[in-house]
């Protein structure tokens, strides 16, 4: 670019860093920064980096309750109280999120598709997960911190979930669960 008299004052490399959702091997932030710094050495260029997803993804967990278990000839389903409106990434992008029981159950496992209660074929949070679970169990859907809440919606008139901050032994509600009344507050009936 310099040979064509194009002088850059800054470069925005975007996010760049991947997140280990399953078995991916993204570069460590230090490796990534060094690779970029080595290419820019000696140049008077401001580097802009947006690491939001790499910072937030593994900082968030969506906790959901198993409401029902059902099976057909081919599949076992765990119907949970969370849905695609709460975490759209698995449905929208086929994103893989680790799903683990909050409490370990010493029982035989089965392979389940974890699905929500919305009447859509795309309402799934995970497919083919080997779990030992029963109705009433809590599941943790890991790596839900990046874009979880910002991409959530009120689809099917479902209030958005609460956000809870856990800091050591301290627990803080940082965003309350929406209510049905809050969903209606901006609406009016025709005269």
Q: Locations of the language-model features?
A:
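Flexible, glycine/charged-enriched surface loops at secondary-structure junctions
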Residues: 3-10, 46-51
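Conserved N-terminal phosphate-binding loop of PLP-dependent enzymes in the Aspartate aminotransferase
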Residues: 28
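Short, hydrophobic/aliphatic alpha-helical segments
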Residues: 2-5, 134-136
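Charged (often Lys/Glu-rich) extended helix/loop segments that serve as interaction or gating elements
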Residues: 35, 44-191
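Catalytic palm subdomain of template-directed nucleic-acid polymerases
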Residues: 18-24
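Alpha-helix-loop-beta-strand connector modules within alpha/beta enzyme cores
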Residues: 1-4, 32-43
């Amino acid at each position: 670019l310099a040979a064509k008299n194009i002088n850059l004052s800054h470069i925005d490399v975007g996010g760049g860093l991947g997140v280990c959702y399953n078995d991916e091997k993204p570069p460590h932030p230090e490796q990534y920064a060094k690779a970029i710094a080595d290419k820019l050495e000696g140049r008077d260029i401001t580097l802009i980096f947006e690491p939001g997803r790499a910072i937030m993804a593994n900082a968030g967990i969506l906790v959901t309750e198993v409401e029902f278990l059902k099976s057909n000839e081919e599949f076992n389903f765990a119907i949970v109280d969370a849905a695609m409106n709460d975490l759209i990434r698995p449905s929208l992008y086929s994103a893989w999120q680790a799903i683990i029981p909050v409490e370990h159950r010493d029982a035989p496992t089965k392979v389940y598709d974890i699905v929500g209660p919305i009447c859509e074929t795309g309402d799934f949070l995970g497919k083919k997960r080997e779990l030992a679970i029963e109705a009433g169990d809590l599941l943790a859907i890991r790596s839900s911190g990046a874009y979880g809440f910002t991409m959530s919606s009120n689809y099917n008139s479902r209030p958005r979930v609460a956000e809870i901050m856990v800091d050591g032994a301290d627990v803080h509600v940082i965003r309350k669960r929406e209510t049905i009344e809050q969903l209606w507050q901006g609406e009016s009936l025709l005269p």
